[in-house]
Amino acid sequence: MTKLLFMGTPDFSATVLKGILADGKYDVLAVVTQPDRAVGRKKEIKMTPVKEVALENNIPVYQPEKLSGSPELEQLMTLGADGIVTAAFGQFLPTKLLESVGFAINVHASLLPKYRGGAPIHYAIINGEKEAGVTIMEMVAKMDAGDMVSKASVEITDEDNVGTMFDRLAVVGRDLLLDTLPGYLSGDIKPIPQNEEEVSFSPNISPDEERIDWNKSSRDIFNHVRGMYPWPVAHTLLEGNRFKLYEVTMSEGKGSPGQVIAKTKNSLTVATGDGAIELKSVQPAGKPRMDIKDFLNGVGRNLEIGDKFGE
């Protein structure tokens, strides 16, 4: 039985780990995941999804803040693993660890060489891609630059957002990994180098990138909101306060970008660079998320045609 170290953090990773454990061909010696974090308004300490799966299966868990140079790194290197599998781990693996095992592969949620980095699904949706996917790749010291072992693609529809794509790609990645590993370990599957001329990057989303640019097209803003949902969530300003947009649809109309151009009891339409969007689900500053009807009948009741978002 092949002995593995598994490294990952979110639900995407947990789905992959569950698949490995259910497959029965691999012995997961240990799991490495990010430290427990305080989440939500109450700042409650929460385990990562991968840690939860590991504990349910009595697998030792390591949670270094930074793996490189940590005592945990030295401990991991003494376990005698044959290889490493990572999926959305969130840290670079030290070269000495990579060199201590027979193989190290990563389940990356993009069709490499496009979208190397930590937010490939976000950028695929924001940029209006028609498909996303998963690449199984060998790990090297350079980020997401290793040779590609296998790929699988998935259509992106207008109904998709980061959450739906994460869920679908986790299952695709799990199945692709389990289909690929036997042939890779036997040498029947030969990894292929990435074409460096086709490389693009998807770094972690910065706070500035969450902000809506109302001068952009309706399609771009629609994609932007979907590409930020359910996290980190797109936002704009309303009367100088942060105003989050969870769901919008493309609409028609003309006006100055960011300007309210239509309002009823149940709908609110805002002008964009080439048309308009209709707001569906929002969160005003200091309030919970709400649908647009509740907003317009509550804190947004004084909003008028001609008022501007983004200011």
From Swiss-Prot:
Binding site for (6S)-5,6,7,8-tetrahydrofolate: S110, L111, L112, P113
EC class (word): transferase
Highest taxon of the lineage: Bacteria
The keyword Protein biosynthesis is assigned to this record: yes
Gene3D superfamilies, per database record: Formyl transferase, C-terminal domain (3.10.25.10), Formyl transferase, N-terminal domain (3.40.50.170)
Catalyzed reactions: L-methionyl-tRNA(fMet) + (6R)-10-formyltetrahydrofolate = N-formyl-L-methionyl-tRNA(fMet) + (6S)-5,6,7,8-tetrahydrofolate + H(+)
Record GO terms (molecular function): methionyl-tRNA formyltransferase activity
Pfam families recorded: Formyl_trans_C, Formyl_trans_N
EC code(s) of this entry: 2.1.2.9
Swiss-Prot/TrEMBL keywords: Protein biosynthesis, Transferase
InterPro entries documented for this protein: Fmt (IPR005794), Formyl_trans_C (IPR005793), Formyl_trans_C_sf (IPR037022), Formyl_transf_N (IPR002376), Formyl_transf_N_sf (IPR036477), Formyl_transferase-like_C_sf (IPR011034), GART_AS (IPR001555), Met-tRNA-FMT_C (IPR044135)
Cellular component, GO annotation: cytosol
Its biological purpose: Attaches a formyl group to the free amino group of methionyl-tRNA(fMet). The formyl group appears to play a dual role in the initiator identity of N-formylmethionyl-tRNA by promoting its recognition by IF2 and preventing the misappropriation of this tRNA by the elongation apparatus.
NCBIfam families (UniProt xref): fmt
Listed PANTHER family: METHIONYL-TRNA FORMYLTRANSFERASE, METHIONYL-TRNA FORMYLTRANSFERASE, MITOCHONDRIAL
Family of the protein in this entry: Belongs to the Fmt family.
Name of protein: Methionyl-tRNA formyltransferase
Species: Streptococcus agalactiae serotype V (strain ATCC BAA-611 / 2603 V/R)
